[in-house]
Each structure stands twice: as structure tokens, then as C-alpha cells.
Amino acid sequence: MVVGAGPAGAAAALEAKRLRPGASVALVDKADFPRDKACGDGLGPHAVDELEALGAAGVLDGYPPIRGLRLRSPRGMEVAGDPARPNYVVPRAVLDARLVEAAQAAGAELHRSTARRLEQRDGLVVVDGELAARVVIGADGANSTVRRLLGVASNPDRALAIAVRGYAPAPAGRPEQLIAWVAEGWPAYVWSVPTGTGVANVGYGLLRSRFHGDRAELHHRLRDLLPEADPDPASLRAHHLPFSSFRPPPGRGRVLLAGDAASLVNPLSGEGIYYALASGRLAARAALTEPDDPLAAYRRLLAKALGRHLRHAAVLARAIHAPALAEAGLGAAAGSPRLFDTLVELGLGQARITPRLLAALPRGLARARAATRGTGSGPAGRTR
């Protein structure tokens, strides 16, 4: 049984039916689909790889690859380029509905319900005294009920972000994603990522521990920090991002946690869809291959697939509390397409901190300071 039908839950259902077509898979969610979900909507190359592995790459149909990416530091240092592989931007209202349809087409049964009680007994997990399964996968998001019922602690504010997202007309010209670190609430960032269909997802996010205002204050900061955007007020939604710099146990007993419910959100970028798809797939694999001890199997699979990358991302996320490191990183990326790709991958996929990146940071800081000296802002470097 899978609780939550977002990317993590749908991936778990798809993988379970792929591995064992005759398996009985219940996909439980309180919402009707399609439904909106506050998110940055970005799918990096590794998320696309996951969709292909699940046989669900068709969910991207109608949304072209977005090749351009521009990064900006708090002092205005910019670097722009085309990463080695493009990204996609698909609104969650579309993506999630298509993934649920794919899971149903594969044979999963969708139930509109919620989980209020969990009991593990006699080799089964009983949900609300009615539904029973050998393994339950909790994929019910940042405010996971399954996680709370298991007694797994929530992320502390130092490892929890709050963000606001809206939809605005996309800027004219070649589609280009903008990720800009900003001093307001540092470490914080704004983004504008076009879907390729005339619309851009725009937003602002920062650590929960650095924000003491209300929703109106979030909206004000977004408009102030991204003045060129004009989001539809009705599209503005706030949401939490539980960063992977806090590592809770990924379940208890026969109940596994995946995606945001397992705090699998990159602390550098807020990216979560790739980690949701990957962890959902791995949770299903663990449930089917080792149903008597799925948690141990799941831990091993997660550690092998994501462990080192997430540790490196957490180290960098702590380090960029010093703004000079962000400047140094962008300065290094401006001088090397390879380092540009490494920086992007640290935020979106599988990269690790490399000796080459560390060696380039002093030169990068000098380049960034030279670019912004005297004016407080600097020209964009282009890597390729």
C-alpha cells in the first residue's frame, strides 16, 4: 500500500507493478486529481532518467526541454550557460495527474482516503482498522501523517525551508531558468523557471529559522526581489521543504517513508522531484524483494543511490551560510563549463564535491569580486 499519490507515491506504485505485475498495489490519496501542488516544478536530467526507468517518460509530453540556465549571486555576479543535459518544467497539477494515470494503467488501484491510524501486527500493517498490507510506503509529503504516526521527528527549523510559488507570464526570448541567491533572509533564493508554454514558475524561499513573518510578507518579498515577474495572485501558494541535511529514519518496521515524507529535499536548491521518484522506486523494490525486513533493504538502497551526494550537498549548504562561498562557487563556474555542470548537479542530481571544485574556489572568489567591484553587481559569464 502506498499513502500519497505525488511523484514518490506514483513512482512506488509504478515500480511495484513493473517488478511484479500480479502484485496488489493500493495507491491512497485524499485529493482528486488533477490538483495543484506548490512546488518549483523542475525536473532535472536524473528525474527524467527515473521516469524513463519507470516507463513513464510520456508525462513530459507537451513540455519542451529548457536548456538555458542563469545563476546569480547576492552581489550580482552572474554565470549563464547550457548544462550538459536540459531540464524540464512541468506544473505539478499536470505531472502528478499523469503519473497517477500511468500507475492506474499499470494496474494500481487508486483510493480516495486518508490514513489516520497505523498498527503493525502479525506481519501486516493495518491502516485505519480496515486496509491491510505487508508493507506500507508513506509518500504523503512534507507534512506527512504517516511519519507523524510512526513517531518520527519533524525537521527542525534549521533544516526546514518555507517558500512561496506563483505562476507568471514567461519572459520574452529564449527560455532560460533563473536561480538567484539573495541577501534578503540569507541563505535564500528566488527563481523563475519557464515551462516552455508561455508560463513561468516563480518563487522565493528561505530557511524557516530565518523567517518570522506571515504569508503576506512572503508575497511581498517575492515581488520585491523578482520585480520583473507578475505572478497571478490566485496562483501564490506557500509550502515547506524538509531538507535532507536532517536525516530521520526512513521508516519503522514494515512502514517506509519516501520523498518529502523522508526529508529528501536538496538543501542547496530545494529540488525534490528527482529524490521523490528515486526513493519511491527504491522503496517499492525493497518492499517486494525483502518484505520481511523491507526497512533494512531500503536503507541500503538509499545509501547506495543517494547517500554520498546528499552528504556533500549538506556540507555545501552549511558552508554557504558564508556568502563569500556562493560568490566563489559562481566565480569558479564562470571559468569552466565542467565546474558549471558540477555546481548544477550538486543542486539537482548526483554530483559530489570534487578536488577540482575545491581548488577552483579561491580563483572563483577573486573573479567574482573583480566582476562586482565598485558597482555591487557584475556582468554574466557564459560557460558554453
Where are these regions (language model features)?
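Glycine-rich FAD pyrophosphate-binding loop
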Residues: 5, 14-39
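N-terminal Rossmann-fold NAD(P) dinucleotide-binding loop
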Residues: 9-10
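Short, well-ordered alpha-helices that flank and scaffold nucleotide-derived cofactor binding pockets
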Residues: 14, 18, 49, 101, ...
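A conserved beta-strand/loop capping segment in the N-terminal third of enzymes
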Residues: 21, 48-100
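Generic enzyme active-site microenvironment
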Residues: 27, 138, 258
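Predominantly flavin-linked oxidoreductase catalytic cores and closely associated redox partners
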Residues: 102-233
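FAD/FMN-dependent oxidoreductases across multiple families
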Residues: 117, 210-287, 292
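C-terminal helical "tail/cap" subdomain of flavin- and related membrane-associated enzymes
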Residues: 285-384
